[in-house]
């Protein structure tokens, strides 16, 4: 499984697609450039995943495309292969592609220097990209494609206007590709404002809860008892790496301090931290220098760390779409994974709503949960 995709689960996936969508069984069948194929195989890919086999050809044809499938199914590589974005630089090693990450919280001068030099691919956060366009350091007249990764998040109220700002600067013929693990109906409706007759490749919702990932809840009578429950779990389980999700930055800081006071080793990350600090924390976690990371939903999307075997929702997500993104951090690359949800009486309705939305059942945590992580 060099490409990090659980092939057994992938093969069972059912899609709802536009009529013109066909399945390309191999990368060769997609008629990709020879140099790109070399990069794909050198990166460890052997054959396309279910979403890749349906979406790559459509994007390469220049069609506006909406691709939705659960975490860990190769969506990032779907558009990376199509436009040579950076899973990135690796796929373009044989093509001399210039890529730059243009993100908030980093040095503006570096962005200006790199963009003035010229880039084939720019990946970035909406605010910084819009800023670079307004400064005229990112020139848009030759842009051929706009990709919205994690589109449900980018098209929510927080980012929507920034995305529209970017889109208004682009040439009318710009191809638009929308990618996400979850695409609520209102987000799909929104795409009609800036996409032209898009091809749709959507996994059926009851497929979305990640086969092979065990989901449990622990009933906790009072909010203030969650901390003791977490400490008991921490003492009981032998984990490789774990992520604990809280709903607010303040809660992340509070829980981190409490855990450290109790002599537990943890790291933490949230959106108030400078980008450089987040990068450093992330690197430590990837290299397994830290085993437990406490975070807000800033960590819930698009981040692969192979050894994460446990996700704990200290707080259930306030947005049910975020549930699938959170638990998808565990059990990646076909490994065993467990998600444990702390549920107070006030949370029962939210838990039932999540079960209904994803057509899944979340059982009470068994006594032998440690065996499931072994």
UniProtKB/Swiss-Prot annotation:
GO molecular function, one term: mRNA binding
Annotated Helicase ATP-binding domain residues: 56-201
Residues that, per the record, bind ATP: 69-76
Localization terms from the record: Nucleus, Nucleolus
Domain Helicase C-terminal: 212-373
Top-level class of the enzyme under EC nomenclature: hydrolase
InterPro entries: DEAD/DEAH_box_helicase_dom, Helicase_ATP-bd, Helicase_C-like, P-loop_NTPase, RNA-helicase_DEAD-box_CS, RNA_helicase_DEAD_Q_motif
Main location: nucleus
An individual GO BP term: mRNA splicing, via spliceosome
Motif Q motif mapped to chain: 25-53
Residue positions of motif DEAD box: 149-152
Gene Ontology cellular component list: catalytic step 2 spliceosome; nucleolar chromatin; nucleolus
Pfam families reported in the protein's UniProt record: DEAD (PF00270), Helicase_C (PF00271)
Segment forming the signal sequence: none
PROSITE patterns attached to this UniProt entry: DEAD_ATP_HELICASE (PS00039), HELICASE_ATP_BIND_1 (PS51192), HELICASE_CTER (PS51194), Q_MOTIF (PS51195)
Keywords per UniProt: ATP-binding, Helicase, Hydrolase, Nucleotide-binding, Nucleus, Ribosome biogenesis, RNA-binding, rRNA processing
Catalytic activity: ATP + H2O = ADP + phosphate + H(+)
EC number per UniProt: 3.6.4.13
Domains: entry comment: The Q motif is unique to and characteristic of the DEAD box family of RNA helicases and controls ATP binding and hydrolysis.
Protein family membership: Belongs to the DEAD box helicase family. DDX48/FAL1 subfamily.
Its job: ATP-dependent RNA helicase involved in 40S ribosomal subunit biogenesis. Required for the processing and cleavage of 35S pre-rRNA at sites A0, A1, and A2, leading to mature 18S rRNA.
Protein's UniProt name: ATP-dependent RNA helicase FAL1
The species this protein was found in: Phaeosphaeria nodorum (strain SN15 / ATCC MYA-4574 / FGSC 10173) (Glume blotch fungus)
Classification lineage: Eukaryota, Fungi, Dikarya, Ascomycota, Pezizomycotina
């Amino acid at each position: 499984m060099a490409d990090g995709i659980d092939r057994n689960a992938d093969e069972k996936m059912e899609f709802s697609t536009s009529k013109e969508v066909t399945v390309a069984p191999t990368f060769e069948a997609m008629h990709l450039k020879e140099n790109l194929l070399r990069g794909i195989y050198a990166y460890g890919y052997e054959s396309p995943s279910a979403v890749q086999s349906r979406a790559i050809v459509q994007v390469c044809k220049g069609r506006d495309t909406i691709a939705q499938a659960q975490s860990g199914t190769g969506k990032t590589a779907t558009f990376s292969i199509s436009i040579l974005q950076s899973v990135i630089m690796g796929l373009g090693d044989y093509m001399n592609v210039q890529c730059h990450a243009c993100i908030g919280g980093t040095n503006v001068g570096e962005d200006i220097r790199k963009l003035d030099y010229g880039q084939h691919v720019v990946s970035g956060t909406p605010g910084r990209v819009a800023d670079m366009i307004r400064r005229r350091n990112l020139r848009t007249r030759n842009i051929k494609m706009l990709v919205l990764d994690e589109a449900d998040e980018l098209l929510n109220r927080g980012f929507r206007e920034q995305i529209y700002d970017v889109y208004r600067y682009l040439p009318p013929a710009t191809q638009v590709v929308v990618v996400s693990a979850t695409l609520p109906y209102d987000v799909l409706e929104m795409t009609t404002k800036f996409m032209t007759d898009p091809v749709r490749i959507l996994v059926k919702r009851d497929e979305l809860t990640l086969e092979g990932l065990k989901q449990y809840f622990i009933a906790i009578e009072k909010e203030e008892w969650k901390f003791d429950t977490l400490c008991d779990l921490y003492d009981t389980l032998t984990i490789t790496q774990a992520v604990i999700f809280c709903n607010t930055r303040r809660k992340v800081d509070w829980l981190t301090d409490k855990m450290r006071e109790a002599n537990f080793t943890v790291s933490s990350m949230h959106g108030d931290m400078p980008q450089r600090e987040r990068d450093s924390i992330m690197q430590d976690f990837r290299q397994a220098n830290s085993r437990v990371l406490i975070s807000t939903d800033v960590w819930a999307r698009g981040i692969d760390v192979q050894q994460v075997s446990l996700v704990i929702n200290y707080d259930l997500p306030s947005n049910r779409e975020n549930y699938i993104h959170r638990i998808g951090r565990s059990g990646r690359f076909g490994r065993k994974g467990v998600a444990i949800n702390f549920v107070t009486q006030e949370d029962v309705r939210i838990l039932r709503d999540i079960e209904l939305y994803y057509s899944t059942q979340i059982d009470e945590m068994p006594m032998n949960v440690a065996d499931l992580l072994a």
